[in-house]
Amino acid sequence: MNFKYIIAVSFLIASAYARSEEYDIQSLSQRDVLEEESLRKIRGIGSAILSAGKSIIKGLAKGLAEHFGKRTAEDHEVMKRLEAAMRDLDSLDYPEEASERETRGFNQEEKEKRIIGPVLGLVGKALGGLLG
């Protein structure tokens, strides 16, 4: 008789343990589902914040490019003069024919006087415009 009770009690204990394991598995799966939902919400919020940040940065970059990218007619003229002066400076470096070398000293001094003064002024204006 005691043997029957021992078997019955152990059967009840085993079935109770099996039910508790089943409930634990269900609660874990429910917890996993809830965690997954909360992670999806967090990811959604994060992606929304990230896209808003990207939009803000793109807007700022576009605004800065428009603001600093605009050249007035005066700036354009200054740049044209600067380019012409640079071409003149480059022409000083080219070798000349022997017949032209006699007048080279005079011509070079004239070119340097004509170029260096305006170039310094243009560079000063350009730097002042960029920094100002």
From Swiss-Prot:
Residues annotated with Leucine amide modification: L131
Keywords: Amidation, Amphibian defense peptide, Antibiotic, Antimicrobial, Cleavage on pair of basic residues, Cytolysis, Fungicide, Hemolysis, Secreted, Signal
Source organism superkingdom: Eukaryota
Location(s), subcellular: Secreted
Prosegment residue ranges: 19-42, 72-112
Signal peptide: 1-18
Entry comment describing in which tissues the protein is expressed: Expressed by the skin glands.
One of the GO biological process terms: defense response to bacterium
Pfam families with a match to the protein in the record: Bombinin
One GO CC term on file: extracellular region
Modified residue annotations for Phenylalanine amide: F68
The family this protein is said to belong to: Belongs to the bombinin family.
Name by which UniProt lists this protein: Bombinin-like peptides
The organism of origin for this protein: Bombina orientalis (Oriental fire-bellied toad)
Gene: BLP8-BH9
